[in-house]
Amino acid sequence: MKAALVYTSTTPELIELVEKEVTKNIGTDAEIISLQDPSILAEVREAGYVTKTAAARLIGMYMEAVAQGADAILNICSSVGEVADSVQTAAAYVGVPIVRIDEDMCKEAVRLGKRVGVLATLATTLEPTKNTISRVARAMGKHVELVDGLIDGAFGLNQEEFRKLLLEAAGKIKDDVDVIVLAQGSMAYVEEDLHEAYGIPVLYSPRFGAIELKKALQEKGMLA
């Protein structure tokens, strides 16, 4: 059994967290294929949207995972999650599901409340995450109010500086939301601090993505 992890952000903290969550869910016997191309996210950040060349390279990574024998693929980056949506027909045709890391997190946010705060350091992640929350809310027959928490100047800071800015940003919206979504997987290490500080449910994508990856493998009969 092989699971492919497709990264467009290669911070060590993110990779460590994702692999920890994946291993916890699918076990240590699974072979992990790690495919990484940070130039994709860099291009998206610079352009402010997912360019056709960035999308093409990401789709190429999916196909490389298939060529390497992956049984399921986890798309790590929320900024390019809509690319994963666009190739679901192809994924079904080759029999290799492509799982978005943030899809079920967004569904859980809608289940937990009508007012959803979205924290992000990149506008290119904030907007796709909001779009996903709105889409799944419609599919669930619910309406949600989205509260932006774009944190300027936080991208690239060390963990302690980032933690401080994130706590400040969450504090500004805490009275206006029922649940907070961390739009980037690399934010996950601040989840406990935010919950303890403000008593609001805080969701991060690697945990949900790993669970969905497990379900995809179970549906193929590869896991009990």
Enumerate the language-model features and the residues they cover.
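Non-catalytic structural scaffold of enzyme domains
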Residues: M1-A224
